[in-house]
Amino acid sequence: DTFGTDAVRWYLMREMPTGADASYTLERFLARYDELANVLGNLVSRSTSMINKYRDGLVPEAASNGLDAEIDYALESARSAIERLKVHDAFAAAMDLARAANVYIEERKPWAQAKDPELASELDETLATLARVLVVLCALFQPVATEKMDELAVRLGLDQVPTLEKAVAEDMTGKKMSTGDPLFPRVHPESMDTTT
């Protein structure tokens, strides 16, 4: 109950490659859960919060997207991994895209862009890029985190989790985003009951 079935599926997909033996340890499970919370969950929280704070929740229009190459690479890597029956590699590619988006936030510094009216178009590009990444990640993670991606789709202003093809083509401009509790709440191991 603490982690939910999505986290268990994530652990199984990441730690137990198809056709190979694997073992379970609480330490490895917590490490994989932290990956969900600190990388994907943090990206969702930061991105939706900034779009709400700086653009009243509406995804702005932008002339270009800053992470197109990273999105293309993640999609190609995921497709290639699936064809080779390396499902764990497909989800690793999805998580790498989330990491790239977190780096993008640190490099672009939207909080600084928001303070300078002359950087309004750059801020729009930053926020639109993050929205596009989130919709692609929603589709990429859907097979393994079905419940949480349903939640994310609602936050992104979508009727449902899109297929990967629709996610790539989705025009997020004008979509109304909402915020919410962390998708994957941080868990402190010292507070866990490990006797059961």
Question: Model-derived features: where do they sit?
Answer:
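Catalytic adenosine-cofactor/nucleotide-binding cores of aminoacyl-tRNA synthetases and other
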Residues: D1-S64, D159-S191
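Secondary-structure capping and boundary motifs in well-ordered enzyme cores
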Residues: F3, R28-V39, A63-I71, E83-A93, ...
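Exposed alpha-helical structural elements
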Residues: D6-A7, R28, G66, E70, ...
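Conserved, charged catalytic cores of large soluble enzymes
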Residues: P17, V44-A78, N102-L119
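Basic, alpha-helical terminal appendages of large translation-related enzymes
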Residues: A22, S80, L85-K86, M95-T196
